[in-house]
């Protein structure tokens, strides 16, 4: 198998912003942005020297996008702050090459953020917002992942994914830099982006319909000065995700590809000012994710990822940082189906990966 790809890309952005403070309790912000993005790619795929046709192998994708936005912040009293805003986005995406077409999109993106501070060091935030994702122009063209025997066609009908987001976060501060933060979030997803089946046995990144995301976020930072260790901070953070979307091949409910159900990280860092030194480390006990394709389900699972670093600043403008990253072995599993409709299992592949240990040294000088 041979896959050749040649291309170029460019991005130009012009942005303007104006702020106006009417009073200490109220201010306004307005502005606009104009952007031009381009990707041109020419690709070829062959098996045993015989060319194989690919959907959208050679394409040029161009986007012209404009956005107007405004925001108002009202500090009602010491306990309540209200922030509201609106973004109006209009874009035109044109394609030429193997596929010639042009699409226009318009999105109104309102945002509301209410902050309540019932007592000192306690805060409750409610956010309601519509978000629109940015497209990866590479998904309009064909691509290949030979490690998993995947060849993807391009998708000329790809359009942005949008979400209505509702998020509630409680934050408690203590001991100076100590924080406990708990967040609940729910997303209603329209035109969720995943992988869709194409004719000829190919697949492509595409929109697979509506979906949902439910999320719980916990973030804890504990200063260790009161525990007898000066300048130290212990940290724990985790995000639990539950997603649902309808699989375009089976019609069954499943998670969205690439979103990890959970990944806890435990950290510690210490600032030793007398030595002009900072050091720290991180540990991830378990990590992994799954991806869903029309012809296969793949994923990887690992445990015990470590990171250790130290940074020395002999002067305010010079720093020397060393870091080591250590991975334990992890397992990659791929289940291949013999037919997209009946989905009999053709084979299951397991690969055990022994990743390298990474060492880094960085010298930084500012002036």
Role assignments for model-derived ranges:
Residues 21-25, 77-81, 117-121, 163, ...:
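Outer-membrane beta-barrel channels and translocator barrels
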């Amino acid at each position: 198998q041979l896959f050749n790809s040649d291309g170029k890309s460019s991005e130009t952005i012009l942005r303007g912003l104006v702020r106006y403070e009417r009073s200490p309790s109220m201010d306004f912000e307005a502005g606009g942005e104009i952007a031009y993005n381009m990707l041109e790619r020419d690709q070829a795929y062959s098996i045993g020297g015989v060319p194989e046709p690919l959907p959208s192998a050679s394409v040029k994708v161009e986007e012209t996008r404009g956005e107007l936005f405004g925001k108002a912040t009202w500090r009602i009293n010491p306990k309540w702050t209200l922030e509201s805003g609106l973004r109006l986005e209009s874009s035109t995406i044109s394609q030429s090459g193997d596929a010639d077409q042009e699409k226009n999109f318009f999105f109104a993106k309102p945002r509301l953020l209410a902050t309540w501070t019932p007592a000192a060091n306690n805060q409750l935030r409610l956010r309601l917002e519509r978000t629109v994702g940015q497209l990866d122009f590479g998904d309009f063209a064909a691509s290949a992942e030979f490690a998993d025997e995947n060849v993807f066609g391009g998708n000329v009908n790809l359009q942005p994914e949008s979400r209505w987001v509702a998020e509630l976060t409680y934050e408690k501060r203590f001991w100076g830099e100590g924080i406990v933060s708990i967040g609940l979030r729910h997303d209603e997803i329209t035109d969720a982006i995943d992988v869709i089946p194409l004719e000829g046995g190919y697949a492509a990144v595409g929109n697979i319909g509506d979906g949902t995301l439910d999320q719980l976020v916990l973030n804890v930072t504990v200063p260790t000065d009161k525990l007898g260790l000066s300048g130290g901070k212990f940290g724990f953070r985790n995000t639990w995700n539950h997603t649902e979307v309808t699989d375009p091949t089976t019609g069954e409910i499943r998670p969205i590809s690439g979103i990890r159900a959970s990944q806890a990280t435990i950290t510690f860092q210490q600032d030793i000012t007398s030595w002009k030194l900072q050091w720290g480390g991180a540990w991830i006990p378990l990590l992994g994710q799954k991806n869903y394709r029309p012809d296969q389900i793949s994923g990887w699972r690992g445990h015990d990822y470590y990171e250790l670093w130290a940074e020395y600043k002999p002067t305010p403008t010079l720093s020397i940082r060393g870091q080591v990253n250590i991975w334990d072995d992890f397992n990659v599993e791929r289940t291949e189906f013999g037919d997209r409709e009946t989905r009999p299992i053709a084979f299951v592949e397991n690969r055990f990966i022994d990743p390298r240990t990474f060492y880094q040294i960085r010298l930084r000088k500012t002036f």
